[in-house]
Regions:
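Activation on beta-sandwich/Ig-like modules and their edge loops
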Residues: 92-244, 249-255, 259-261, 300
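Middle-to-C-terminal accessory/interaction subdomains
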Residues: 1-19, 26-27, 34, 208-210
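Short strand-edge motifs at loop-to-beta-strand transitions and within beta-strands
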Residues: 59-63, 163, 364-368
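Structural beta-strand segments of beta-rich domains
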Residues: 27-31, 122-124, 315-319, 330
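Exposed beta-strand face motif in extracellular beta-rich ectodomains
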Residues: 70-74, 193-195, 377-381
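Short, composition-biased motifs enriched in small/polar/acidic residues
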Residues: 255-387
Length: 387
């Protein structure tokens, strides 16, 4: 509907603590503010995902923002109904939270290099990542299957930080350089065909226990071609046992131990013309945001970005879509509808493959098998992208 221009304009501002910087011991932090009726959504600067917001009155709002440990410079953007940014405000919130034991949702297995090519077998490694806002105490956290290793007492892992356990420290340093966060060495080797990897807390509680594989739909490029397995969306509390949670690393040569190989939407957008999120500059039917996820160029019309489908003899459908390898925290799920109004994840969808495509930028093609709902006269499918 039209905006009521009789309503006096209200500048977009953060009002918590009078807009002044402050400290807190909890995360997420709730920020309050004010804004005008033309605001459709509020998000963190550089993000494409709206924050969950509550409008407490016609022109006042609240949002919850997760914090990392220490100072957090938070810049919020107000986005109107055309997708334009109509206001920004910033505040620094310092998280004074303490040290916590790891949980399955806060300590993830973020990268696995299980089958290096040729004579590089001794460069194997496993990477852990802290996805929380607190420092994690990894004292006596231990791998009990796949590899054998216990973290020494006093091992701490800061928010967003990564830690590596490696097969051979000398071989690892020769391959990847010095200065990486190596916690220690495991005496055995990872299976080249995949196996169970199990990580337990000091009290014996299982943090993660899952089987990875070298067979589809697991990324086959990690099986001897020099790529690692990378957890695609580590901040989403992903199911490590689900092959859809993983992708092959951006490059061969062992992946990116100790670091991310993703590119944020904000950085990609700035490097590609900084067009509005919902703008289709090249007229190929895909917005700037969709070009990022699909692996396109917002200035080059590319019909190859369109999802494909094929009807199988038994009445099932094969549908596939491309995904930019470096899309940060990108998940993709098929959704179905019988009337184009209500959409839902398809519980019967079978994930079949995740194959790296030739060319640049690096793009994977994900393929699923869908079964039409029984008795449905019509059946529609689409893909949902997002963190």
């Amino acid at each position: 509907g039209a905006i009521n221009t009789d309503t006096p304009a209200v500048p977009f501002t953060i009002t918590t603590n009078g807009g002044a910087n402050f400290s807190t011991g909890t995360s997420p932090v709730t920020l309050a503010g004010q804004g005008w009726v033309n605001i459709r959504e509020i998000r963190l600067a550089g993000s494409t995902v709206p924050l969950a917001s509550t409008w407490t009155s016609v022109n006042t709002w609240q949002v919850a923002v997760p914090l990392t440990f220490g100072p957090n410079v938070i810049t919020l953007e107000a986005v109107d109904f055309t997708g334009a940014v109509v206001g920004t405000d910033s505040i620094t919130v310092t998280n004074t939270g303490g040290i916590e034991p790891p949980q399955p949702s806060t300590l993830v297995v973020s990268e696995i290099y299980y089958n290096p090519p040729g004579n590089l077998e001794t460069t194997e490694y496993v990477e852990l990542m802290n996805t929380s806002a607190a420092t994690l105490d990894l004292s006596n956290v231990n791998f009990t299957a796949g590899v054998t290793f216990a973290f020494p007492g006093g091992t701490l892992l800061g928010p967003g930080s990564r830690l590596l356990v490696v097969k051979d420290s000398a071989a690892f340093t020769a391959a990847f350089g010095s200065g990486l966060p190596v916690a220690g060495v495991f005496p055995n080797s990872l299976s080249n065909s995949g196996e169970r990897l199990e990580l337990r807390r000091a009290d014996g509680a299982i943090l993660h226990s899952f089987v990875f594989s070298d067979l589809p739909p697991w990324p086959v490029e990690a099986d001897g071609d020099g790529y690692s397995l990378v957890l695609a969306n580590p901040y989403s509390n992903p199911d490590h046992a689900n092959p859809l949670s993983w992708r092959a690393s951006l490059v061969a040569g062992g992946g990116s131990p100790g670091a991310s190989d993703s590119q944020s939407y904000a950085a990609w957008k700035a490097a590609n013309g900084n067009h509005a999120d919902d703008e289709d500059v090249d007229g190929d039917g895909f917005t700037t945001r969709e070009e990022y996820f699909l692996g396109g160029n917002p200035l080059v019309a590319e019909q190859t970005l369109k999802p494909t489908f094929q009807i199988e003899p038994g009445g099932t459908f094969l549908i596939s879509v491309t995904r930019r390898v470096t899309a940060e925290n990108a998940t993709v799920l098929p959704e179905i509808s019988t009337g184009l109004i209500n959409w839902a994840n398809d519980p019967t969808a079978i994930f079949l493959s995740n194959i790296r495509q030739p060319g640049s930028p690096a793009v994977d093609r994900l393929t699923f098998r869908l079964t039409p709902p029984p008795g449905a006269p019509r059946f529609f499918a689409r893909f949902a992208f997002g963190p």
